[in-house]
Regions:
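Active-site pocket-lining segments that scaffold enzyme catalytic pockets across diverse folds
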Residues: 27-60
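Short helix/loop capping segments that flank catalytic or ligand/cofactor-binding pockets
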Residues: 25-26, 67-68, 118
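Internal gly/pro-rich beta-alpha loop/helix module
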Residues: 1-12, 17, 29, 183
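Acidic-glycine-rich active-site phosphate/pyrophosphate-binding loop
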Residues: 56-78
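Residue-level preference for the first positions of well-ordered beta-strands
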Residues: 11-15, 54-56, 105-107, 132
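Thiamine diphosphate
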Residues: 1-6, 42-46, 50, 70-187
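Short beta-strand segments
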Residues: 15-19, 58-60, 109-110, 135-139
Length: 187
């Protein structure tokens, strides 16, 4: 209230600075990574080696887009046409749907936070059931790139969720060992 009055009277912006970990304690994904030995960058690299050259990738905000960009820039054989949704949290699936409706192969690399933020898009995807659309959920249980706050995705049965929205298939990769096999079935 005082800051708003000050801002209005002086016609100047104000800011409230909050110490790290004041609102919510950061969670660590190290335990989860050790448990299933599957990192996001490992998966993205495997995916890039498995897809057709003309396949477009739309990647969600944060580390997913940065890691995809890094892999594309540093491995010349993996160059492609990607759309990095940096700052567009929750919208990668709808952009991907639009691309697929134009009869183009597209993969959406989505995060659990992003997916939960715009669940209505899942119904549109299930309704249109585009044949050239592949939706990949990278569930790390947190908004990693903006401080690691929990997404509350623990306990959600995503198979039941996408079934309810009309998705036709569901595949789950739990560890490095089954990554290639599941990607082959999925793609």
């Amino acid at each position: 209230s005082k800051l708003l009055k000050y801002s209005a009277s002086k016609n100047k912006p104000v800011a409230v600075l909050i110490k790290n970990k004041t609102i919510e304690q950061e969670i660590s994904n190290k335990k989860n990574k050790k448990k299933n030995n599957l990192s996001r960058i490992f998966f993205i690299k495997k995916l890039l080696k498995s897809i057709k050259k003309q396949t477009k990738i739309v990647s969600t905000t944060g580390y997913t887009s940065r890691e995809l960009f890094y892999l594309r820039e540093n491995y010349t054989k993996l160059k492609g046409k990607d759309f990095y949704m940096v700052g567009g949290m929750g919208h990668s699936s709808m952009v991907s749907l639009g691309i697929s409706i134009n009869n183009q192969d597209v993969i959406c690399l989505d995060g659990d936070g992003s997916m939960l933020m715009h669940m209505g898009s899942l119904r549109s995807i299930g309704f249109y059931n585009p044949k050239k659309f592949k939706h990949i959920l990278l569930n790390n249980f947190c908004h990693e790139s903006v401080g690691g706050q929990e997404t509350m995705s623990k306990g959600i049965d995503f198979k039941k969720v996408i079934d309810a929205f009309g998705y036709k298939n569901y595949f789950s990769i739990k560890n490095k060992e089954n990554t290639n096999l599941i990607l082959k079935k999925f793609l």
